[in-house]
């Protein structure tokens, strides 16, 4: 099932020099976002840069949100991850999509124009309404926190 999402092109190279975000395979969950920078840039070790993607989206449906996630190869091979770890795009946001790019490695990382930098995934949203209680019904876990369930 495909849900229509409004997309605005902010950089004219998208759709001409570089393709619109799209799913690479039938099983893909995310669409690649590209670095729509004006010139090749180097991100120094420990540095964070905000990178434009050249697009804006409007999800519009309050039952959906978008998340910007890292591409696994960049983090594993080069130490390039998202500065905010996950970018959450609310359904009513209409501004440009930007990627906070953090070089957590000890080596400079060169980013070329149009490089695939992150991925965009759409997820369902449930808006909760809190019900105030004095006590919770008991559960198997109870108040056990970090590491409570073990490692094996």
UniProtKB/Swiss-Prot annotation:
Gene3D superfamilies: 2.70.40.10. It holds the Pfam family dUTPase. The keyword Protease does not apply. Its EC number is 3.6.1.23. GO terms for molecular function: dUTP diphosphatase activity; magnesium ion binding. Substrate binds at residues 71-73, 84, 88-90, 98. Pathway: Pyrimidine metabolism; dUMP biosynthesis; dUMP from dCTP (dUTP route): step 2/2. Its cofactor is Mg(2+). HAMAP family: dUTPase_bact. This is Deoxyuridine 5'-triphosphate nucleotidohydrolase. It comes from Shewanella sp. (strain W3-18-1).
